[in-house]
A protein has these predicted regions:
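A well-structured
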Residues: 1-138
């Protein structure tokens, strides 16, 4: 089924972007110099935004609409489509700007968390934690 293959190709690109974001995050926590944090926040925000835009592309919704309920799908493919639909529906509820802001905040809060842990002073992280909680509730 061509629509299913098209969807898989789009999802592969989204997954690759997620893997790149994970590598950037890992590097930030393990090896990156502290002074590089603002640039890393920008990089992570960009990759999060681009990934979100691809996932919420109306073409993904069109492909899902075309594929859902197809008699041609195997059981595993049908399960995959249900999961993709759930991800698509959730993602489309979040504005891209919000996703970008979350990525920037998450990256910057790693810096304050690391400093708070090193100094044993968790008040350093309090404001970032508060913002994280507010974003999670939004």
């Amino acid at each position: 089924m061509k629509a299913y293959e098209d969807l898989l190709e789009r999802l592969r690109e989204i997954d690759l972007m997620g893997q790149i974001g994970s590598l950037l995050s890992w590097d930030q926590e393990v090896m990156m110099p502290k002074k590089a944090a603002p640039l890393r926040a920008e990089q992570l925000a960009w990759i999060s935004k681009a990934s979100h835009e691809r996932l919420t592309d109306p073409k993904i919704g069109e492909l899902l609409d075309e594929i859902e309920g197809s008699e041609e799908l195997e059981e595993v493919q049908s399960a995959n489509i249900r999961l993709v639909r759930k991800s698509f529906d959730r993602a489309t509820k979040l504005p891209t700007d919000f996703v970008e802001e979350m990525a920037i905040h998450r990256s910057k809060s790693i810096v304050s968390w690391t400093e708070a842990r090193e100094k044993g002073d968790f008040s350093i992280f309090r404001d970032d934690l508060s913002v994280s909680i507010d974003q999670a509730r939004a």
